[in-house]
């Protein structure tokens, strides 16, 4: 096989491969949204179920700078309950991803002692959230549906 022919064949195979990856993007973005939303929503529900313990944890364990423990508990819990719903719907998806990224970052910063495995989980979640914020939540979203109708996207 000559060099130009080899280059053409390689380029054609690469184009097919990237076409498959492009076709998988909507499903991958949705899977990331559903996974992240579940993690944070369940965390918010746990905080809501035992509010006194949540406030105690924010008083003793989670040292959120500049906020009272009550305010930090309320804001963190509200973010963990509202933003995942937006993320699942893909409504204001980038805003929701950025908001959860901040919640995730504050959780890491606020913990005085975090186990390496827990830190690794937070880095993974942060990476997924950063990807959704940077690249968008994908075409299987209300943001995409609204944009196709000429309305502002999230």
Describe the predicted segments one by one.
Residues 1-49, 66-78, 82, 89-154:
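Extended, low-polarity transmembrane helix blocks
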Residues 55-67:
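Perimembrane loop-to-helix junctions flanking transmembrane segments
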């Amino acid at each position: 096989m000559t060099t130009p022919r080899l280059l053409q064949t390689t380029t054609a195979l690469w184009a097919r491969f990237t076409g498959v990856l492009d076709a998988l993007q909507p499903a991958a973005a949705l899977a990331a949204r559903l996974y992240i939303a579940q993690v944070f929503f369940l965390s918010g529900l746990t905080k809501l179920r035992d509010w006194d313990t949540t406030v105690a944890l924010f008083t003793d364990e989670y040292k959120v700078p500049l906020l009272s423990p009550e305010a930090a508990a309320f804001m963190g819990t509200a973010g963990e309950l509202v933003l995942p719903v937006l993320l699942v719907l893909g409504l204001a998806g980038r805003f929701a991803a950025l908001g959860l990224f901040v919640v995730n970052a504050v959780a890491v910063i606020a913990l005085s002692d975090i186990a390496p495995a827990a830190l690794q989980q937070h880095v993974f979640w942060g990476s997924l959230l950063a990807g959704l914020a940077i690249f968008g939540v994908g075409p299987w979203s209300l943001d995409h549906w609204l944009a196709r109708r000429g309305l502002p996207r999230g």
